[in-house]
Structure formats: C-alpha cells, structure tokens
C-alpha cells in the first residue's frame, strides 16, 4: 500500500509518501519563515507552495498520483487556517483520484512514526516541540498522557529567549550554538508539579537578568536547566510505568545536547535510548503517511476535518 501524507498543522507544509513494503519513499516540505507564526500568512504559503511540494514528492518517489492507495492528512491539533487548507486539499485529491482519505492526529503521528523508525516496543515518548512538551505512553492499548507543560512548550520558550537576545529565527539552532561557548551556569527557577512542569518562570527570570550575563551563558544555562528538568520527569515516569525504552520526538529533539543528556540518563538507569534523524523529528509528511497507513490497516478511521484542539489520549 502506498500512502500520501499531508502535514499542515502550523508553519510547515509537507508531503510524504510511505510504502508498506519499502518504507519512506519521499519526504518533502516547505516552511514559513519569520518570528512566531501568523496563521493566515502560513496558510497563504501552503496554498502557494503545495503543488510544488506535492510534485517534488511524487518525483522523489518515482510514482504518479494514480499509484496512491490512501491519502492521510494531519487534522489536528494545530492552526485552524492551515488545517482547513490542508484537509481541503486532501479531500479534493481523494475525490479526484477516488481514493479513501483519513484524518490523523499530528502528535500521535510524531510518536508512532518514531516508534516505527526506532523499532521500539514499549517506550516512553518525550514530545518536545514549539507548542508542546508532553510525556506520553501506551497503556492498555490506549494513549496515556503521563505529564505535560502547564504553560508554554519548550520550543516556544527557547524561541522567545532567542528573540530577546536578538537572535535570528529559528531560535533553537542559534541557542544551541551559543550554548557551546557558555561557561557560567546561571541558577534558574523551575517548577515541577507531579509529572507536569512550568516553564514561564524561567522565561520571566531570564528577561529580568539578560543584560547581566553574556548571551553564551544565558543560552548555556537555559539548555542545561530546561533539559535537566524534562529528563528528570522522564526518568521518574519511566520508573513509575516500568518502561525500559526512551524516545525523544518533536523539533526540539533535534538538539544534540538534549540527546546527549538523554543518552547519559538512559545509560545510568539501564534504559534503551533511541536517537533519531532530525529530518523525521520536525514536522513532516512522512509521519502523517505512516500513521495513515497504520491506523487504516488497524481499522481506525477519523474523518478528514480540522480539529485544532484534538486530544485523543486519556
């Protein structure tokens, strides 16, 4: 089965093609540039570029639209304008080709695709992106939300600090590079509530003291404290749920320092940690295509329509 996947939840419009026998055949995308996300401007970019991205993916896979058996689209959670456009495109293609169309959950796609790539059995998923920071697991065949941020996502925190330091967008890679030159670990406040966390206090504190320290030390301290906080919760959750495998997903999971710290934590606890390629951690169409295939083969179906606040876990 060949599945075409459309990612359209936020700044990225992606088209991926997944073959049930050969794996990922193509994974093409275009990303909205600029600080923050302006939903309508992002949707305009998607509208302008979708046909080019689609054709590029088909060329990479060396197939035509007629070879597609199923269309999957990210139906949420995400920004309503981009979700509307992406789901409209998917439904239009389905009608034109007379092929079934399935809506899939963006966050579940990140995690199920990561599990597929890692060949993991029963991991704890740490999903770290711009808007989200969540600790997820599969318990009794259902998605279980172990813990999450109670205010802002770690990616948003990093981007906000980067902007306040005068760094260009995207902020994550810039902070990561600056952090390598930092030497002074600044003590930052943080809040853990059970297996939940709050990051707003760190941002407020950095805004107050940013002129007292070098950009390098602020970047270094931000990464060390925030990543340690995330992995502390992950470690506790893994012991609580008796999980032996750890996977980082989402765009922030591209950060090498976070991966190094996760690897060290896993080693100390005799856990298995899976380090995945960055191209499949950021938003992409391949993960949507894969989850579409996986759900469809399991008899799971959701209508392709925008669901900006879609949560399907317990």
Swiss-Prot record:
InterPro entries linked: ATPase_NBD (IPR043129), Gcp-like_dom (IPR000905), KAE1/TsaD (IPR017861), Kae1_archaea_euk (IPR034680)
Cofactor descriptive note: Binds 1 Fe(2+) ion per subunit.
EC number: 2.3.1.234
Principal subcellular localisation of the protein: cytoplasm
Residues reported to bind substrate: 127-131, 159, 172, 176, 255
Entry annotated with the keyword Plastid: no
Positions of disulphide bridges: none
SUPFAM superfamilies per UniProt: Actin-like ATPase domain (SSF53067)
Compartments where located: Cytoplasm
A GO cellular-component term linked to this record: EKC/KEOPS complex
Record keywords: Acyltransferase, Cytoplasm, Iron, Metal-binding, Transferase, tRNA processing
GO MF term set: iron ion binding; N(6)-L-threonylcarbamoyladenine synthase activity
Cofactors required: Fe(2+)
Binding locations of Fe cation: 106, 110, 127, 283
Database matches in Pfam families: TsaD
Recorded catalytic activity of this chain's protein: L-threonylcarbamoyladenylate + adenosine(37) in tRNA = N(6)-L-threonylcarbamoyladenosine(37) in tRNA + AMP + H(+)
Listed GO biological process terms: tRNA threonylcarbamoyladenosine modification
Family: Belongs to the KAE1 / TsaD family.
Record-linked HAMAP family: Kae1
NCBIfam families according to UniProt: arch_KAE1, gcp_kae1
Purpose of the protein: Required for the formation of a threonylcarbamoyl group on adenosine at position 37 (t(6)A37) in tRNAs that read codons beginning with adenine. Is probably involved in the transfer of the threonylcarbamoyl moiety of threonylcarbamoyl-AMP (TC-AMP) to the N6 group of A37.
Protein name: tRNA N6-adenosine threonylcarbamoyltransferase
Organism: Nanoarchaeum equitans (strain Kin4-M)
Organism classification: Archaea, Nanobdellota, Candidatus Nanoarchaeia, Nanoarchaeales, Nanoarchaeaceae
């Amino acid at each position: 089965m060949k599945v075409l996947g459309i990612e359209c939840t936020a700044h990225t419009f992606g088209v991926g093609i997944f073959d049930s026998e050969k794996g990922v055949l193509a994974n093409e995308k275009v990303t909205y540039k600029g600080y923050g996300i302006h939903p309508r401007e992002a949707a305009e970019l998607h509208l302008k570029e979708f046909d080019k991205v689609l054709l590029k993916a088909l060329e990479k896979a060396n197939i035509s639209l007629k070879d597609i058996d199923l269309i999957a689209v990210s139906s949420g959670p995400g920004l309503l304008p981009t979700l509307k456009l992406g789901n409209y495109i998917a439904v239009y293609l389905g009608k034109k080709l007379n092929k079934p169309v399935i809506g899939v959950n963006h966050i579940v796609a990140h995690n199920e695709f990561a599990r597929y790539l890692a060949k993991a059995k029963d991991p704890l998923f740490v999903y770290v992106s711009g808007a989200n920071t969540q600790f997820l697991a599969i318990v009794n065949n259902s998605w279980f939300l172990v813990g999450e941020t109670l205010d802002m996502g770690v990616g948003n925190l990093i981007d906000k600090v980067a902007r306040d330091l005068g760094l260009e967008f995207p902020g994550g890679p810039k902070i990561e590079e600056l952090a390598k030159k930092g030497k002074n670990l600044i003590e930052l406040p943080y809040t853990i509530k059970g297996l939940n966390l709050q990051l707003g206090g760190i941002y407020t504190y950095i805004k107050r003291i940013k002129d007292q320290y070098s950009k390098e030390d602020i970047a270094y301290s931000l990464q060390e404290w925030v990543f340690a906080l995330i992995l502390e919760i992950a470690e506790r959750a893994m012991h609580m749920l008796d999980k032996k495998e750890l996977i980082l997903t989402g765009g922030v999971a591209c950060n090498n320092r976070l991966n190094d710290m996760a690897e060290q934590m896993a080693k100390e606890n005799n856990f298995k940690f899976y380090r995945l390629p960055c191209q499949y951690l950021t938003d992409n169409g391949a993960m949507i295509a894969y989850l579409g295939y996986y759900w469809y083969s399991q008899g799971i179906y959701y209508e392709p329509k925008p669901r900006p606040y879609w949560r399907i876990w317990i």
